[in-house]
Amino acid sequence: FEFMDKEFRKTYDYLFDKTEKLFYRDDSYFNKTEANGKKVFWGRGNGWAIAGIANILKSLPANSEYRNYYESIFRSLAQSLIKLQDGKGAWHASLLDPDSYPAPETSCTALITYALIYGLNNGLLTQQEAYEPAIKAWNVLCEAIHENGKLGWVQPSGQDPKKVTKDMTATFGVGAFLLAATEM
């Protein structure tokens, strides 16, 4: 855990925006902005981050000296993400510019849903703050499943927000959906 913690803290200190309380994908995005003039925070990237922190917490012993640090970051990131959820329950490819990417993006929605439900199931988030957002997100995910079982609205592999359509899918999106299902 010591090595993981050392590397995570370096990454957190470097890529976490203390104002927006979100993670940049990498340092090439520090000075980039979206069409609306806001910073670029990739939905799936922040989904990976909060899901990863949930997995760190799953691995840490209850009495770990590291637990409070990761619980604090988890709660802060969850609260930021909840505020950015759209009215239907989805998150978008660009967290701060959903108008440029109006379609729901299911890989980030699934990763965030997994983390929110993990937080609820483990007492890290309250019912009042996270239950409704988690259920709304789960419903969006279920509605994104085609009749043939394909999960739609998954942004293809990439490194930044891109437009997504109902017919786009990828295995990592399905994996994120299944991960969320493990906490339901």
Give the ranges of each region predicted by the language model.
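CBM-like carbohydrate-recognition segments
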Residues: W91-H92, P98-M184
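Loop-centered beta-sheet repeat module
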Residues: F1-A54
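Conserved catalytic-core motifs characterized by acidic clusters
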Residues: F23-N31, S94, P156-D160
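Structural helix-adjacent loops and short alpha-helical linkers that scaffold large soluble proteins
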Residues: F1-K6, L57-R75, I82, G119-K136, ...
